[in-house]
């Protein structure tokens, strides 16, 4: 049987459209990277913002990874916060360059529902792009926690929360 080239193009076009629609649908549930800037003298504000989300993510079968600079998470705090102790992993005492690299690797695996890392400096555009790609690949969330002192905060912008989301752009 003979089929024209036009018919073949038409079917390949509809396949391409279906594939694009499938990718678009998949991307709406893809990963997210967000930067949370908070005052060091008011850590409770950050907990109020993030704990409900972390509790909800704790219901997934995946881990939560905390990359903390020096402090160690208290078992009592994790349990009192309603987070699943059996799904929370922590790595501490990482240098800032290792924190970003570790976040990228962890997000990419898909083993973590959320990866939280502390950084003193803002991300470069390249680092942010790498984190976004890794979060999308692993269908995970990443939070960059950036503390500022009360003195620094007074001279900076008034907004303390920077949320990157494809839902609003």
UniProtKB/Swiss-Prot annotation:
It comes from the Bacteria. Gene3D superfamilies: P-loop containing nucleotide triphosphate hydrolases (3.40.50.300). Keywords: Cell cycle, Cell division, DNA damage, Septation, SOS response. Induction: By DNA damage, as part of the SOS response. Is rapidly cleaved and degraded by the Lon protease once DNA damage is repaired. Residues 162-169 are annotated as: Lon protease binding. The record marks 169 as: Essential for degradation by Lon protease. One of its GO terms (biological process) is SOS response. Residues 106-112 are annotated as: FtsZ binding. Coiled coil: none annotated. PANTHER family: BLR3025 PROTEIN-RELATED, CELL DIVISION INHIBITOR SULA. Interacts with FtsZ. Belongs to the SulA family. This is Cell division inhibitor SulA. It comes from Escherichia fergusonii (strain ATCC 35469 / DSM 13698 / CCUG 18766 / IAM 14443 / JCM 21226 / LMG 7866 / NBRC 102419 / NCTC 12128 / CDC 0568-73). The gene is sulA.
């Amino acid at each position: 049987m003979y089929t024209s080239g036009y018919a073949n193009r038409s079917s390949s076009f509809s396949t391409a459209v279906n594939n694009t629609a499938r990718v678009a649908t998949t991307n709406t549930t893809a990963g997210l990277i967000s930067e949370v800037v908070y005052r060091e003298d008011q850590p409770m504000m950050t907990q109020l913002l993030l704990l409900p989300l972390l509790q909800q993510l704790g219901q997934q079968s995946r881990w939560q990874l905390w990359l903390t600079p020096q402090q160690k998470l208290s078992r009592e705090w994790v349990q009192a916060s309603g987070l699943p102790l059996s799904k929370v992993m922590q790595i501490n005492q990482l240098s800032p360059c290792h924190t970003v690299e570790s976040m990228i690797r962890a997000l990419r695996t898909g083993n973590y529902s959320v990866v939280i890392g502390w950084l003193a400096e803002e991300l470069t555009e390249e680092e942010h792009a790498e984190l976004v790609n890794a979060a999308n690949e692993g269908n995970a969330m990443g939070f960059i926690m950036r503390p500022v002192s009360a003195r620094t905060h007074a001279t900076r912008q008034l907004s303390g929360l920077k949320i990157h989301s494809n839902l609003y752009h």
